[in-house]
């Protein structure tokens, strides 16, 4: 009977060792699981383990979280408590087995009974020794984890963090708004400073013109109260510019109609004769001596002597050339803007009303003087444009003298004849053939645009008509 008893004792010892190892493994798994939950949730308030031989984790709602906080803290602080909690069950089982063995083997010796009593007493001593150790561990857990003792701390800590985050967010928003306001102010100040210096040159730009005719017209409009001397000086300059443009235009367009040439000559003569008209805007005592002398000479009739009147016009042209500065003389032969300004000036109704009627009767005399400068008669002169050679390329002019109050008409033929009536009663026009001249004289006439001065004083040969 001894081997059977030995086997039973060894099997009971092995069962106790296996149970101890299994419980130890379960405790390690529980500790790892709780560490993971603490890392994710922050605390173990919602975790609860079920009762039984094999405990299972269970998560509680937030309402029951505060009630289970203390229990969870105790369980975490005493991981060995569960191990010894299961020992009483095993002890009862062991006692039952030992009682059965005693009842079955009542005939055993007293030595075996004493050994069983010693084993039972050893289990009781182990229980008594572990009770004070459990109380010590509970005190230490309370000191180490004060958050677990207070039910309000788990709720207040996340709320405090949220409030701090919200405060930092509001501070960043206010800082951003302040920076945006400052940048907007700097932009507006910079824009205002950039606009202020540009206002001056922009207002003065309309007064700047490249062409001298436009510059004179703009100054006349912007300065209505200018001195009379400057105004008369601008009038003389305008007349000279028109005279040069007319001569250049005649050279560039040899096939121009006689009606347009007569209109151009009339405008030139009107510009010369209107110089005294501008003197009404100021006191009569400030009129220059040259303009006054010219007005006195123009009021005289053609009966006083054609040579004297022609010399007066030539003298006036020289005076204008001497008084005109070089900067005001146009370099281009026929500037378009100058002609546009001059034509607008001639068509102005105010200037026409200011001019006296006596000067309008003297405009044909000025044209007569222009024809006498070339040594021609007062009759209509027609230069034949059908001739070949350099004469046709340089000058092909038709000069007519329309009657007063009648607009010239453009009726010309290619063979060099004209049907316009003359000023003295539709006289028969004489055709004067152009004599060949030297190429040097023709080239100088075309380049300088002053053909009247080049041919002045040269004899003209006329042939009888027919």
Swiss-Prot record:
The keyword Phosphoprotein applies. It comes from the Eukaryota. Residues 132-153, 297-306 have a biased composition (Basic and acidic residues). Residues 105-157, 214-233, 238-310, 394-466 are annotated as: Disordered. Residues 6-35 form the IQ domain. Residues 282-293 have a biased composition (Polar residues). Coiled coil: none annotated. Keywords: Phosphoprotein. InterPro entries: IQCC. The modification Phosphoserine is found at residue 438. This is IQ domain-containing protein C. It comes from Homo sapiens. The lineage of its organism: Eukaryota, Metazoa, Chordata, Craniata, Vertebrata.
């Amino acid at each position: 009977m001894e081997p059977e008893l030995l086997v039973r004792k060894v099997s009971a010892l092995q069962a106790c060792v296996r149970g101890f190892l299994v419980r130890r493994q379960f405790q390690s798994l529980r500790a790892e699981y709780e560490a993971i939950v603490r890392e994710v949730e922050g605390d173990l308030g919602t975790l609860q383990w079920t009762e039984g031989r094999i405990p299972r984790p269970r998560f509680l709602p937030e309402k029951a979280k505060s009630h289970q906080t203390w229990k969870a803290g105790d369980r975490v602080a005493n991981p060995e408590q569960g191990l010894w909690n299961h020992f009483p069950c095993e002890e009862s089982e062991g006692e039952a087995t030992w009682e059965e063995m005693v009842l079955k083997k009542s005939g055993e010796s007293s030595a075996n009974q004493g050994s069983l009593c010693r084993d039972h007493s050893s289990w009781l001593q182990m229980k008594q020794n572990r009770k004070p150790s459990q109380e010590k561990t509970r005190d230490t857990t309370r000191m180490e984890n004060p958050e677990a003792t207070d039910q309000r701390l788990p709720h207040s800590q996340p709320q405090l963090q949220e409030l701090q985050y919200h405060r930092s967010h509001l501070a960043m928003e206010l800082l951003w708004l302040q920076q945006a306001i400052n940048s907007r102010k700097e932009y507006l100040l910079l824009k205002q400073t950039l606009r202020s210096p540009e206002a001056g040159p922009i207002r003065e730009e309309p007064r700047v013109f490249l062409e001298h005719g436009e510059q004179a017209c703009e100054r006349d409009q912007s300065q209505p109260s200018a001195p009379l001397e400057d105004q008369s000086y601008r009038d003389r300059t305008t007349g000279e510019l028109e005279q040069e443009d007319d001569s250049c235009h005649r050279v560039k367009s040899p096939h121009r109609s006689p009606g347009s040439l007569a209109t151009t000559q009339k405008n030139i003569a009107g510009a010369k004769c209107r110089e005294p008209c501008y003197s009404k805007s100021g006191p009569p005592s400030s009129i220059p001596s040259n303009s006054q002398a010219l007005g006195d000479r123009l009021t005289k009739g053609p009966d006083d002597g054609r040579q004297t009147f022609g010399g007066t016009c030539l003298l006036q042209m020289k005076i204008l050339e001497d008084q005109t500065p070089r900067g005001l003389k146009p370099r281009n032969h026929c500037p378009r803007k100058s002609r546009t300004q001059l034509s607008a000036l001639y068509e102005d109704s105010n200037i026409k009303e200011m001019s006296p009627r006596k000067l309008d009767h003297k405009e044909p005399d000025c044209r007569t003087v222009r024809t006498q400068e070339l040594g021609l008669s007062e009759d209509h002169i027609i230069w034949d444009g059908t001739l070949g050679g350099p004469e046709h390329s340089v000058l092909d002019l038709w000069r007519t003298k329309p009657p007063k109050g009648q607009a010239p008409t453009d009726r010309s033929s290619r063979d060099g004849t004209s049907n316009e009536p003359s000023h003295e009663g539709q006289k028969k026009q004489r055709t004067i053939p152009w004599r060949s001249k030297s190429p040097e004289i023709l080239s100088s006439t075309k380049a300088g645009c002053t053909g009247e001065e080049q041919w002045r004083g040269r004899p003209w040969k006329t042939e009888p008509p027919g």
